[in-house]
Regions:
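Walker B catalytic motif
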Residues: 154-155, 160, 453-456, 460-463, ...
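ABC-family P-loop ATPase nucleotide-binding domains
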Residues: 71-134, 145, 238, 381-442, ...
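Conserved beta-strand-loop-alpha-helix hinge in the C-terminal portion
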Residues: 201-232, 499-510
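Conserved H-loop
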Residues: 184-190, 485-491
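Hydrophobic anchor residue at the start of the ABC signature
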Residues: 139, 440, 468
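ABC ATPase nucleotide-binding domain signature region
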Residues: 32-38, 44-101, 199-204, 346, ...
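Conserved beta-strand
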Residues: 5-8, 15-28, 64, 321-325, ...
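Coupling and communication elements adjacent to P-loop NTPase active sites across diverse families
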Residues: 1-12, 101-125, 222-330
Length: 510
């Protein structure tokens, strides 16, 4: 075994909110352990704690025991470390001789991930890479190192479909132990052999942590079946208990009436004795009620919908791009871009990492911003491009003065599982999923009738994913998105296009 925990509990230092409760976990050699849970429930915190508690000591309180029996861990974080951004690719791969790296493997992984090996020694700044390419270079270098355990935080984020398939196969077939956080249901279904589920219930005052050595789909099915079985049992118990109590109330009422109407002392003593017996029986029933099957705690996910939007008339053209060029940092990405989208259409865009998908969404956003006939909603790849990180969720949505708007915003935030403390935290302190919820809520409040979304589902938990797909599937406006989420593309988008250097072309299937 590589990791064992006993009664591991984790709390936030700031507000003492529980994230992990009494986790007893064994991670053996070869296990593929997926950590899942709602946004802001502490998945990344648990991952770092299992790797090295010193990484979280500044903001978390940890109790219980953790034993580690690994010597060569690899860790790829959710976001590119700041110190890497201004390095060149040559710096990243070759500036220091690392004896743990198998360079033959490194070049093989670069080839398999369609990352031109000539670029490995180039002076291109890492900051100029696309989100998917930044993750690729970390995978290429890290996986070529000697290791006995791998920690990955949202490894499927930003990856194109080919790389995603490669990573799924790597995890599924690797003899190494891999512990990872993921939101991608297809990815989880193809890779996980053990599930650690972090839940937060009772308005985030109670943490529930469960572990199952089982694949993800079986876990979902088992959890859903157990949930509804417990509901049924709890309802049956209450129904039977109510029958017993109804009979008891009738008997108690009869004895009370008899007692009130008895004037004979001897008969009165007998009736009083009977009342004492009835009251004793009532106390027994109250104790029985405590042992009845409890209604299961349910962790709500996303409860949100677009209402009262004014759709653009169906005949109207939203996008009409004819033979334009797409540039990024003085680099020509696409030289002959044609794109037409009519009102009401839902279009998905896929393509290789670095081809320009996020640049295309930005281009369309700039193109549509000046249109007075549209109410535009936008979710960029990097939330900080739009979110004022120093503000709180409440002031971002409702400003600081309008009380009515603030009350409405508080109601919406509560429906998205923000606590009263979290609505006053700086946006920079929120998880990626919580920041995504804020952008989503902003679009709803703005009654946006055209949405431009860059990877809209990537930071939402597997529990929230079906709600997200339903939200956008029911949406009555126009939607254009970049996504590598296969379920999202299948269930939401009417058409899917692939972007390449030559332009966009329509796919029959994905």
């Amino acid at each position: 075994m590589l990791i064992t925990t006993q009664n591991l509990s984790i709390h936030h230092q700031k507000d003492l909110r529980p994230l992990v409760a009494d986790l007893t976990l064994t991670i053996n050699s070869g296990d593929k352990v997926a950590i899942i849970g709602e946004e802001g429930n502490g998945k990344s915190s648990l991952l770092k704690t299992l790797l090295n508690p010193d990484m979280v000591a500044d903001y978390l309180l940890i109790s219980g025991t953790i034993q580690r029996h690994f010597t060569a861990p690899i860790y790829i974080p959710q976001s590119l470390p700041l110190e890497m951004a201004e390095l060149t690719l040559n710096d990243h791969f070759f500036s220091q001789v690392d004896l743990d790296i198998d360079f033959g493997l490194l070049y093989r992984y670069a080839d398999q991930l369609a990352f031109d090996s000539d670029r490995l020694s180039s002076d291109q700044l890492i900051s100029s890479l696309s989100g998917g390419e930044k993750l690729k270079i970390q995978l290429i270098k890290s996986l070529a190192k000697h290791s006995d355990i791998i920690f990955l935080d949202e490894p499927s984020n930003d990856l194109d479909l080919d790389t995603l398939s490669w990573l799924e196969n790597y995890i599924a077939t690797s003899p190494k132990t891999i512990v990872y956080v993921s939101h991608d249901e297809d990815f989880l279904a193809k890779t996980a052999t053990k599930i650690v589920h972090l839940q937060s219930v009772k308005k985030k005052m109670l943490a529930k942590t469960s572990v199952q050595t089982i694949d993800y789909q079986a876990y979902r099915d088992q959890r859903e079946a157990a949930y509804y079985k417990q509901i049924q049992q709890a309802q049956n118990d209450r129904k039977e208990f109510e029958k017993v109590m109804e009979k008891h109330r009738r008997q108690k009422s009869q004895v009370r009436n008899t007692l009130l109407n008895t004037h004979d002392a001897t008969a009165g003593r007998l009736v009083a004795k009977k009342m004492k017996s009835v009251l004793a029986r009532e106390k027994r029933y109250e104790k029985q009620a405590e042992s009845m099957t409890k209604m299961p705690y349910h962790e709500d996910a996303i409860h949100l919908f677009f209402s009262d939007i004014q759709p653009v008339p169906a005949h109207k053209q939203i996008i009409d791009v004819q033979g334009e060029e797409l540039w990024c940092h003085e680099r020509l990405l696409v030289k002959n871009l044609f794109m037409k989208v009519k009102a009401g259409e839902k279009v998905g865009i896929i393509g290789a990492n670095g081809v320009g998908k996020s640049s295309l969404i930005k281009f369309l956003y700039q193109h549509l911003q000046t249109r007075s006939d549209l109410q535009l909603g936008y979710m960029p790849q990097h939330y900080a491009d739009l979110l004022p990180l120093s503000k709180t969720p409440l002031t971002f949505l409702a400003g600081e003065k309008d009380k009515e708007e603030q009350e409405a915003a508080l109601t919406y935030l509560a429906s998205l599982q923000f606590t009263r403390e979290e609505v006053h935290h700086a946006i920079s302190d929120l998880s990626g999923g919580q920041q995504a919820k804020l952008l989503l809520l902003k679009m709803v409040l703005d009654k946006a009738n055209v949405l431009l979304l860059d990877e809209p589902s990537r930071n939402f938990s597997p529990i929230s994913q079906p709600y997200i797909r339903e939200l956008f599937s029911d949406y009555q406006g126009t939607l254009i998105c970049v996504s590598h989420d296969r379920r999202f593309l299948r269930e939401v988008c009417h058409q899917v296009y692939k972007l390449s250097k030559q332009g966009l072309y329509r796919l029959d299937s994905i």
